[in-house]
Amino acid sequence: MAQLAGQPVVILPEGTQRYVGRDAQRLNILAARIIAETVRTTLGPKGMDKMLVDSLGDIVITNDGATILDEMDIQHPAAKMMVEVAKTQDKEAGDGTTTAVVIAGELLRKAEELLDQNIHPSIIIKGYALAAEKAQEILDEIAKDVDVEDREILKKAAVTSITGKAAEEEREYLAEIAVEAVKQVAEKVGETYKVDLDNIKFEKKEGGSVKDTQLIKGVVIDKEVVHPGMPKRVEGAKIALINEALEVKETETDAEIRITSPEQLQAFLEQEEKMLREMVDKIKEVGANVVFVQKGIDDLAQHYLAKYGIMAVRRVKKSDMEKLAKATGAKIVTNVRDLTPEDLGEAELVEQRKVAGENMIFVEGCKNPKAVTILIRGGTEHVVDEVERALEDAVKVVKDIVEDGKIVAAGGAPEIELSIRLDEYAKEVGGKEQLAIEAFAEALKVIPRTLAENAGLDPIETLVKVIAAHKEKGPTIGVDVFEGEPADMLERGVIAPVRVPKQAIKSASEAAIMILRIDDVIAASKLEKDKEGGKGGSEDFGSDLD
């Protein structure tokens, strides 16, 4: 309801809630900060885990920021923006999701302090934008160029990423797998490398221990051989990939055949058998001894394939067919009649094995495969899931370094360097924007402070020590949470791709700026639920924060 010349004017439907100016900003900032506080305790190698139980009783135990926020049913629109920060970070850099969300929350906390001092949001926004831009320049300056062929550097980055997750006991072993997987699928484009993560398949099976996780230079498919009479092991495999069914095709039109005698029926059945046999004969003729079919295989076709000693697998997913093509060099053929010996792929071994009581097909020993599989094992479903998340992050981190060839020290070192340098930059800018840039610089200290706090150290004392050591010894000094002292993170092998902090600051500052721009929130009333389904009417918009 608005007022014009003393007359109330109703312009919004009944039950609509509206928050204007400072109230709208306070609500949005509070919602975003609650999200940041939720994930803050998971940051760093000593961070804690969260247990999330959904409405069906399914449990997820993780300290991965993106997973936590993805699993939470968040209603508030400003809080949803923070979830987007984590998703963007995960997609672009692969790691640093918690860092991005925590920085965004702290930027908003500092912005709120400035708003309380009557500094206009547009000044804060301008200051934050200048600081974020300068931060990107500083990160490019302090980044170290590395040789992407140096496996030791790649392994250290992978170990840093895995440390603090449930899988950290086997972090050295898992880091080796991550590095080997990325190196195997990396393709050189000009002077740089490109890594398509779709070519790394993660297959999970409960049972065994994390140490039983293995990298297969080929493809593992969660299927079994279609006929008991077929070979379960084929060495020197010649592989055909077919994306049509090995069945008699049905006609497009609804046609009826009137059979008036037993001879006609017999001729009809014989023709069907002949068509299926021709398909199988064609496969045998080109020299294939293993067939992967995207659709079904008729029982009769199965019989003939088994008779010829050809291993066949049916209803293989399209994504798996593409990986098989990448790994073996086979071409996916739509029509069996078009199959030629040149379309076949090769592998040293195709074998059906039992893993955790279930049959799986292993395609191994491919020549320079451009698709690989990581078979993840672990004692429980939760362990397997968390190992998968840890390996996905590690693989993405290694990919970033292979593509960019640049790293920074981790452990809060880049954030401290940025904080110190942005403080100096603020003085150059001057004006009221200086206050916003200083607030941005101060907000970045939340990362080393939280790392110390989560490790049980005194955050203030640790931060003072680290900043002093950082100013004296250089931009690679960070928080060693295991020793509780400042340390050269580069020497300790605690490193990250420069893409991680760059993207974290970009995402966090953009989210903070977007939330600060909002000065009016108009929330329509929720739709009434049907009477037997519980309460109806509108819900309070602010109640989502409670």
Swiss-Prot record:
Gene3D superfamilies hit by this protein: GroEL, GroEL-like equatorial domain, TCP-1-like chaperonin intermediate domain
Oligomer and partners: Forms a Heterooligomeric complex of two stacked eight-membered rings.
Superkingdom of source: Archaea
Alphabetized InterPro entries for the sequence: Chaperone_TCP-1, Chaperonin_TCP-1_CS, Cpn60/GroEL/TCP-1, GroEL-like_apical_dom_sf, GROEL-like_equatorial_sf, TCP-1-like_intermed_sf, TCP-1_chaperonin, thermosome_alpha
Database matches in Pfam families: Cpn60_TCP1 (PF00118)
NCBIfam families assigned to the protein according to its UniProt record, in alphabetical order: thermosome_alpha, thermosome_arch, thermosome_beta
Alphabetical list of SUPFAM superfamilies matching this protein: GroEL apical domain-like (SSF52029), GroEL equatorial domain-like (SSF48592), GroEL-intermediate domain like (SSF54849)
Keywords linked to the UniProt accession: ATP-binding, Chaperone, Nucleotide-binding
Family, as annotated: Belongs to the TCP-1 chaperonin family.
Name this protein carries in UniProt: Thermosome subunit beta
Role this protein plays: Molecular chaperone; binds unfolded polypeptides in vitro, and has a weak ATPase activity.
Any one GO molecular function term: ATP binding
CDD domains reported in the protein's UniProt record: cpn60
